[in-house]
């Protein structure tokens, strides 16, 4: 070997190899640039399944009975490499299901158990999810056996439900149908902290004022699911912790009764692990060595499993019989006084004073040894907070009521992000309709669509009226938790009919016209609202010299006010809508960033966003009739004028106020139009400008109309399952 060869062998043979690890991205170089990547996730390039694979159809082929039996058998099939406490994996599986579902937050519908994202960073390596990697490996033989008919997302949620059944709880039911993603989500904001479990006073704190938690977050620290089990910032104080519990659970759509039920029911079985030194634990899965094969928190200095495992640092079981569903949690919590102690790992925990020997749980590995039960600071909040205490006492005195309330709350926890009941699959789907499922009755599809369209066209409503009303009805859809959308026509009900963004006065004028047409034709109001938007677009395209038929799928139903939880729907209120060039007020986040967020929640791509904004502007759909961004002299005609004038270099753009710009002639300096940041971004951002230029081309006037119609139809049908 020559010296030259020896020297070259030490170098990376692929000169761009660093691009696969720690390269600086465009966002690093230009932090203010838009992250359009959130609009381009989970596509064919990352999904290994064929394009015609439909999980909702595939899961229907699953042998549900066999799966249930396999999971029940797995619960007591302890593995030497990660032994089950008391020979039962129930507590571990419940914690896994809970932590997968518990990331859901109502503000944007993101998080939750619906995608199997617990397999990926950052969730797979959060401190609060320590050792849940072991739970997934224990489940792997079942996933391997059932293959494509069973997603990880369904299995992770179902394992906890089966764990409860195996320990004696009558569960409320279960619905399959969660489809896996194949890489981490890029759209979820988990917080701005730069370290795990950063205290409240850290420089990037999620708190302000009197412990006001930043929206949309629903956990008190980076890396936790809900609250710190040791207390606020690790300092025990049950009443302060009660505040954190109430806020975080409310942001997951749980009331006080559901909160107590879930806290107690979650801690009725299983145990916390802290019998050792946390300093001996290796890194989390994403930081572990390659030969650890995706497992983290490994203790390579001592036994580190079973009785010697360290997870939260708290050590012990909450109840006397941790593998059996019973009312023991409240018996211990309410009948004993508790004092603060430190676990072997140094974590704060509460232990009973003068407890009877028979009330102590036995050791997980030695039935001849008993230990004190424990409570976390959150558990003590169930006793110390006056409202939680009342609920706890009722549950204590009525075990059947507690069991039913918990079963329902657990079902809600594990299904909250699945959307309407129509998406549930399997033999155990409950027949009962629940208000949080946003029920919509079946609609009529057997009516003369052309006759309805003719009545709409003759109604005297303008293109703007028709398109805007349909848009406002449909834009509430969130692909995150499948809530909102045009189905149900809730745009005519409280609270939506009164939202500022929906222009209540316009709705009060337009909706009665459409409701009368629905009554006369047998169509639902929901269908007529969407059809009106389609009619408006067809008229606008025709006025521009293009004949087009907007596709329509009938059969939407009309929800009633009784089917609508007003408070629950308040979180869907738009505080901004870049498509209609509207902001309720100025925010710290820029209007264009909010447009991206809205677009991602609606399930649209950057190209679809571009063509929709350009089309909506020329159709005259701006909120309040604003002229900002209406770059056309032919309002009401579906033309590509927005893009033509946006990209025309005979104009200059000058700021004249916050989020306001004037478009002036370079030559005369006369003001031609006004615009907002949402308009300008399509000429400023290099990617969006590329799309804008495409639609401004002389040969793409027809393509613009075709693409607008396709994107519009996607929005109108987004909630049809």
UniProtKB/Swiss-Prot annotation:
Listed PROSITE patterns: PEROXIDASE_2 (PS00436), PEROXIDASE_4 (PS50873)
State the GO CC annotations: cytosol
Q: Where is this site: Transition state stabilizer?
A: 95
So where does heme b get bound? Answer: 267
Gene3D superfamilies attached here?
1.10.520.10, Peroxidase, domain 2 (1.10.420.10)
Explain the post-translational modification.
Answer: Formation of the three residue Trp-Tyr-Met cross-link is important for the catalase, but not the peroxidase activity of the enzyme.
Q: Which UniProt keywords apply?
A: Heme, Hydrogen peroxide, Iron, Metal-binding, Oxidoreductase, Peroxidase
Pfam families, per database record: peroxidase
Catalysis: reaction(s): H2O2 + AH2 = A + 2 H2O; 2 H2O2 = O2 + 2 H2O
Enzyme Commission number(s): 1.11.1.21
Matching entries from InterPro entries are given as: Catalase_peroxidase (IPR000763), Haem_peroxidase (IPR002016), Haem_peroxidase_sf (IPR010255), Peroxidases_AS (IPR019794)
Which GO MF terms are attached to this record? catalase activity; heme binding; metal ion binding
The entry's family comment says:
Belongs to the peroxidase family. Peroxidase/catalase subfamily.
Q: Which HAMAP family match?
A: Catal_peroxid (MF_01961)
**Known partners and oligomeric status:** Homodimer or homotetramer.
Q: What is the role of the protein in this entry?
A: Bifunctional enzyme with both catalase and broad-spectrum peroxidase activity.
Kindly provide the name given to this protein in its UniProt entry: Catalase-peroxidase 1
Q: Which gene encodes it?
A: katG1
């Amino acid at each position: 070997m020559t010296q030259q060869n020896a020297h070259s062998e030490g170098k990376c043979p692929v000169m761009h190899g660093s691009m696969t690890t720690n390269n600086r991205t465009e966002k690093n170089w230009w932090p203010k640039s838009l992250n359009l990547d959130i609009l381009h996730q989970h596509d064919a390039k990352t999904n290994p399944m064929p394009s015609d694979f439909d999980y909702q159809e595939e899961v229907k082929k699953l042998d549900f009975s066999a799966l249930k039996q396999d999971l029940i058998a797995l619960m007591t099939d302890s593995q030497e490499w990660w032994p089950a406490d008391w020979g039962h994996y129930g507590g571990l599986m419940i914690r896994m299901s809970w932590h997968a579902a518990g990331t859901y937050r109502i503000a944007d519908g993101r998080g939750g158990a619906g995608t199997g994202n617990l397999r990926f960073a950052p969730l797979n390596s959060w401190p609060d999810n320590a050792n849940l990697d072991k739970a997934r490996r224990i489940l792997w033989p079942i996933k391997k056996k059932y293959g494509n008919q069973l997603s990880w997302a369904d299995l992770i949620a179902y394992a906890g439900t089966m764990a409860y059944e195996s320990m004696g709880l009558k569960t409320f039911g279960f619905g399959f149908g969660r489809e896996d993603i194949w890489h981490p989500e890029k759209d979820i904001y988990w917080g701005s902290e730069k370290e795990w479990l950063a205290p409240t006073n850290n420089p990037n704190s999620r708190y302000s004022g009197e412990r006001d938690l930043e929206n949309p977050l629903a956990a008190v620290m980076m890396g936790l699911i809900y609250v710190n089990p040791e207390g606020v910032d690790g300092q025990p104080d049950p009443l302060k912790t009660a505040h954190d519990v109430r806020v975080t659970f409310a942001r997951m759509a749980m009331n006080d009764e559901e909160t107590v039920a879930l806290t107690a029911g979650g801690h009725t079985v299983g145990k916390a692990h802290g019998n050792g030194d946390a300093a001996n634990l290796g890194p989390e899965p994403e930081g572990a060595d390659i030969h650890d094969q995706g497992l983290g928190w490994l203790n390579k200095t001592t036994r580190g499993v079973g009785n010697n495992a360290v997870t939260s640092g708290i050590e012990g079981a909450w109840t006397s019989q941790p593998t059996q569903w019973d009312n023991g949690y409240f018996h211990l919590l309410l009948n004993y006084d508790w004092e603060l102690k430190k676990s072997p790992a140094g974590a704060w925990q509460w232990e009973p004073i003068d407890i009877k020997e028979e009330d102590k749980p036995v050791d997980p590995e030695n039935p001849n040894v008993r230990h004190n039960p424990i409570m976390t600071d959150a558990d003590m909040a169930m006793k110390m907070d006056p409202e939680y205490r009342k609920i706890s006492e009722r549950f204590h005195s009525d075990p059947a009521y507690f069991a039913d309330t918990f079963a329902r709350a657990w079902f809600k926890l594990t299904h909250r992000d699945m959307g309407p009941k129509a998406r549930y699959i399997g033999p155990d789907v409950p027949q009962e309709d629940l208000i949080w499922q946003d029920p919509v009755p079946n609609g009529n599809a057997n009516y003369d669509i052309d006759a309805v369209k003719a009545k709409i066209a003759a109604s005297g409503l303008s293109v703007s009226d028709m398109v805007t009303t349909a848009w406002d009805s449909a834009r509430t859809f969130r692909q995150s938790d499948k809530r909102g959308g045009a189905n149900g026509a809730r745009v005519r009900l409280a609270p939506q009919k009164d939202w500022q963004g929906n222009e209540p006065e316009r709705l009060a004028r337009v909706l009665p016209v459409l409701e009368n047409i629905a009554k006369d034709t047998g169509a639902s109001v929901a269908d007529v609202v969407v059809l009106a938007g389609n009619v408006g677009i067809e008229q606008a395209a025709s006025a521009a010299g293009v004949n087009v038929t907007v596709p329509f799928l009938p059969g939407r139903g009309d929800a009633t006010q009784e089917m609508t939880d007003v408070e629950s729907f308040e979180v869907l209120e738009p505080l901004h809508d870049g498509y209609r060039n509207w902001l309720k007020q100025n925010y710290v986040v820029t209007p264009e960033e909010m447009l991206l967020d809205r677009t991602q929640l609606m399930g649209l791509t950057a190209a679809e966003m571009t063509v929709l904004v350009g089309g909506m502007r020329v159709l005259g759909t701006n909120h309040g009739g604003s002229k900002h961004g209406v770059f056309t002299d032919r309002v009401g005609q579906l033309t590509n004028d927005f893009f033509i004038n946006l990209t025309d270099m005979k104009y200059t753009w000058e700021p004249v106020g916050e989020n306001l710009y004037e478009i002036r002639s370079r030559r005369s300096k006369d003001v031609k139009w006004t615009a907002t940041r949402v308009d300008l971004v399509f000429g400023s951002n290099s990617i969006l400008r590329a799309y804008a230029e495409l639609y401004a081309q002389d040969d793409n006037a027809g393509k613009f109309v075709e693409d607008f119609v396709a994107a519009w139809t996607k929005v109108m049908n987004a909630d049809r399952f």
